[in-house]
């Protein structure tokens, strides 16, 4: 199984095909388990597959929402112009969600502490941001964060990042998550003065929902019909 890619676009195409070919039927998805891979060029965040039609404008809005630190979906609506239905389904009675990762890394000043740690102790193994918090499981009824943690390490004088996820939907989750995590990596790089290294991404469960299977073939069938 290939585990190193130039960028997220290469990884998306590879795992889309692999999920079709080797994925296990799991609930309403096709899934692969304990998938880990490296992106050598984390700044290359574009997903170019024509059948995916990735919305970079939305990914940028989600990143700005993370930077705001607000758990309120209304803040995303102000930035993007509307609140996608998936966030409406996940919000609590106060219109808040747990999966604004910026809100999570600002709690306890985690991001600031990671930056300080990397600057003061480049060999640290503790530069970790925790997203999922087992002590808050009673709050996760509608919205359980898909990401466990993000860890940074200095190797060969470059900043490397590892993202560990309990669950990752390849179609929506990975495409938007990799954009935001890459932006986070660039921000930490700028604040610490280290060059960007590699981005390692691990998902215990990497999946496609069944309604996203065959989207590449559907596009080809439409092209053949109108040829």
Regions found by a protein language model. Give the residues of each.
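Terminal, non-catalytic protein-protein interaction segments that mediate quaternary/complex assembly
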Residues: 1-227
